[in-house]
Amino acid sequence: MRQGLLVLALVLVLVLVLAAGSQVQEWYPRESHALNWNKFSGFWYILATATDAQGFLPARDKRKLGASVVKVNKVGQLRVLLAFRRGQGCGRAQPRHPGTSGHLWASLSVKGVKAFHVLSTDYSYGLVYLRLGRATQNYKNLLLFHRQNVSSFQSLKEFMDACDILGLSKAAVILPKDASRTHTILP
């Protein structure tokens, strides 16, 4: 009788652990097969970010809104430009997307871009997961894109919930407005 209860308890613990792990996997970056890349294309403000990579953002006193331009070059090829204002101008990254699956692979200009996932969007905002790294190093980056330079409460809440799931809550930053030159990265 005791062995039966012990086995039952172990099975119950195993089922609970597997269920908890699968819930994270269901949300954790998934493919965006239903994403309309033409609607997602265009200019975006980067209103918030969370990262575990050092040096991804300027110093705290120099942080301003970032910007991004997403463009479909041709069928199956996506080009993404990210810019954050720095003391000497904008820091830019131009990774390219060779397939249609939602993954963004690095071009020669940016080494170490492993993935670009759109986790959630209604085409007025986008929650984007960017994975950077080389060899055994991996860095998680979560970006909140918005068409306007202000965000809704709901999209900020979704951003913070995603930060919790990815373990980036302490690194979450809401970027202050800067209307001076963010629009200058437009092609």
From Swiss-Prot:
It is found in: Secreted. GO terms for cellular component: extracellular region. Residues 1-19 form the signal peptide. Keywords: Acetylation, Disulfide bond, Glycoprotein, Secreted, Signal, Transport. GO terms for biological process: heart development; inflammatory response; macrophage activation; response to lipopolysaccharide; response to type II interferon; response to X-ray. Belongs to the calycin superfamily. Lipocalin family. May play a role in male fertility. May act as a retinoid carrier protein within the epididymis. This is Epididymal-specific lipocalin-10. It comes from Homo sapiens (Human).
